[in-house]
């Protein structure tokens, strides 16, 4: 009992996040990773709740250092050479085995009756397995990638959903907001390290060079997305926690700023819009209207003064983003190509790894090249079957958020909305690590809904 309490505590979560940040900055991820895997494995064997796993799940990928990245611009073989691949496989296998033990010991016995959203989630999972099947030039890597999607959208979702059964849902939401602050600490810390140490990331005229915004695990778009999607959770924290409300409001501001500094236009639009929406409606709705009004007034005046005084520096710093304007950056040609592939293979698509001759090229080295739009990816890679299954699944996920509606669940849904809207021009729905937070939010919200039904 004492051990489980320790693993589920805020100090433990903070220690995990701090180790991830230190491991990334010092390029000692292969020292930190085994430590975290061993701790998580011990927790899986000794804890009844999966709460302990959330900080590791939501920060683990951020260990990857740009210098050692298997993706652009270094194409390093650091992780796959010598003894390092053995260390990675050994400790990830330990983590995987302990997770399977936990599912068998704690999750499966808790399944009573039909799990929520089972049929839609199962249909989506089957469509993942069938991606590209029967298509000429089918690549078996597509099957493996489909299985990885199932691991996130089916296995991980139900493991977290049942693993959190019995937890106080109010406490879970507060803990999730706290975890968001730790994720922000890691991401912003890594960005500060990048902006202050990468040679050439600031050009001679003071602009951030967009092509240099790389953290090993992602380039500007995934980085901006990973920071921006935290904004709804900080809006929730500002509404829910009057004592720490000002802290969470400031975190909303900081995350918006750093999301924009990634030079990602997607992040500029989504994070900027999210902040404005939450800051505005918080003035009229919820439990902390006075704080929203005061901070909004101060921020508005400060922003106007700041732009007037530092206009030249701001325009220089953001010139890479400004100069891009409203060009499609190749998206339209990708979407036309996706539709052509859909015409060639309309039932099951061409598969995830058949979209491009360079389909193994990507920032993480093992992700396929995709069409940068959820619908286009579904049509080209998974066909009509995949698109229909995803539509059924997506509709089914609305129920726990909007039935027995509350402001808290609306703000949790804002995380899902951010996830979906950002993916209109990117691949975040199918970069499985960018779906981890979404999966956690969905599992917690389903538990909240279950508790509401029981109370009735």
Model-inferred region functions:
Residues 14-21, 42-43, 232-234, 409-422, ...:
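Transmembrane alpha-helices of multi-pass inner-membrane enzymes
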Residues 116-123, 174-186, 251-254, 288-311:
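Hydrophobic alpha-helical membrane-interfacial segments at the cytosolic entry of transmembrane helices
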Residues 122-126, 152-155, 171-201, 216-282, ...:
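Alpha-helical transmembrane segments of multi-pass inner-membrane proteins
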Residues 82-94, 114-128, 137-162, 180:
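Aromatic-anchored transmembrane helix interface
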Residues 189-195, 279-322, 339-343:
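A membrane-periplasm/extracellular boundary helix in multi-pass inner-membrane enzymes
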Residues 319-382:
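Long extracytoplasmic/lumenal interhelical loops at the membrane interface
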Residues 382-420:
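Hydrophobic transmembrane alpha-helices and their immediate junctions
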Residues 2-101, 130, 419:
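N-terminal signal-anchor transmembrane segment
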């Amino acid at each position: 009992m004492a051990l489980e309490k320790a693993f589920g505590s805020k100090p433990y979560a903070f220690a995990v996040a701090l180790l991830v940040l230190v491991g990334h900055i010092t390029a000692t991820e292969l020292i930190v990773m085994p430590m975290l895997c061993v701790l998580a494995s011990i927790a899986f064997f000794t804890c009844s709740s999966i709460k302990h796993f959330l900080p590791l799940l939501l920060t683990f990928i951020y260990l990857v250092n740009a210098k050692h990245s298997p993706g652009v611009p270094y194409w390093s073989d650091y992780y796959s050479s010598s003894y390092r691949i053995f260390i990675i496989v050994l400790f990830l296998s330990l983590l995987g085995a302990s997770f399977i033990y936990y599912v068998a010991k704690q999750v499966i016995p808790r399944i009573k009756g039909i799990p929520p959203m089972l049929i839609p989630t199962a249909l989506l999972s089957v469509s993942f397995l069938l991606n590209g099947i029967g298509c000429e030039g089918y690549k078996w890597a597509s099957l493996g990638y489909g299985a990885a999607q199932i691991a996130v959208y089916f296995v991980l979702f139900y493991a977290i959903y049942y693993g959190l059964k019995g937890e106080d849902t109010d406490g879970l939401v507060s803990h999730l907001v706290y975890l968001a602050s730790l994720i922000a600490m890691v991401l912003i810390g890594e960005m500060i390290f990048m902006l202050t140490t990468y040679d050439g990331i600031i050009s001679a005229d003071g602009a951030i060079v967009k092509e240099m915004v790389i953290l090993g695990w992602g380039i500007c778009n995934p980085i901006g997305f990973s920071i921006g999607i935290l904004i709804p959770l900080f809006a929730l924290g500002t509404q829910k926690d009057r004592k720490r409300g000002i802290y969470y409001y400031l975190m909303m501001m900081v995350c918006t700023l750093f999301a924009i500094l990634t030079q990602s236009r997607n992040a500029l639009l989504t994070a900027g819009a999210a902040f404005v929406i939450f800051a505005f409606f918080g003035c009229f709705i919820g439990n902390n209207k006075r704080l929203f009004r005061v901070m909004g007034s101060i921020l508005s005046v400060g922003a106007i003064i700041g732009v007037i005084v530092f206009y030249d520096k701001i325009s220089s710093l953001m010139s890479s983003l400004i100069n891009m304007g409203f060009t499609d950056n190749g998206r339209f040609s990708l979407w036309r190509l996706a539709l052509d592939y859909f015409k060639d293979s309309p039932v099951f698509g061409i598969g995830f790894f058949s979209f491009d001759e360079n389909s193994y090229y990507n920032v993480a080295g093992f992700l396929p090249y995709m069409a940068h739009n959820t619908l286009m990816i579904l049509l080209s890679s998974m066909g009509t079957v995949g698109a229909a299954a995803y539509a059924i699944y997506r509709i089914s996920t609305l129920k726990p958020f909007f039935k027995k509606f509350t402001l808290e669940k609306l703000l949790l849904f804002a995380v899902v909305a951010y996830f979906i809207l950002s993916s209109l021009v990117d691949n975040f729905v199918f970069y499985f690590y960018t779906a981890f937070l979404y999966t956690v939010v969905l599992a917690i919200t389903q538990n909240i809904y279950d508790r509401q039904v029981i109370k009735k």
